[in-house]
Amino acid sequence: MAGKPVERPFSDILTSIRYWVIHSITVPALFIAGWLFVSTGLAYDVFGTPRPNEYFTEDRQEAPLITDRFNALEQVKKLSGN
């Protein structure tokens, strides 16, 4: 055996050039990807949330709340217009 494996000290990781080369690319890329995901409206489509202009319609100006947990499906159908 060559010896026990030892964890690398965190200060060594933070001061290494390799750490900053990798993270200076990935952190901004993740930020930009998240911003594009939300700003293009893809987040609304993926998670099924209504867009800000779809919360209130001409016919319904109150908040679309589900109030009866046992008849929730009927309320959702009524609120969505299906």
Swiss-Prot record:
Record key words, sorted: Chloroplast, Electron transport, Heme, Iron, Membrane, Metal-binding, Photosynthesis, Photosystem II, Plastid, Thylakoid, Transmembrane, Transmembrane helix, Transport
Transmembrane segments: 21-35
Main location: plastid
Membrane topology term: Single-pass membrane protein
Essential cofactor(s): heme b
Cystine residue pairs: none
Subcellular location: Plastid, Chloroplast thylakoid membrane
Cofactor note: With its partner (PsbF) binds heme. PSII binds additional chlorophylls, carotenoids and specific lipids.
Residue sites binding heme per the record: H23
GO CC terms: chloroplast thylakoid membrane; photosystem II reaction center
Signal peptide (residue range): none
HAMAP family: PSII_PsbE
Name the UniProt record assigns to this protein: Cytochrome b559 subunit alpha
Naturally occurring in which organism (per UniProt): Chlamydomonas reinhardtii (Chlamydomonas smithii)
Lineage: Eukaryota, Viridiplantae, Chlorophyta, core chlorophytes, Chlorophyceae
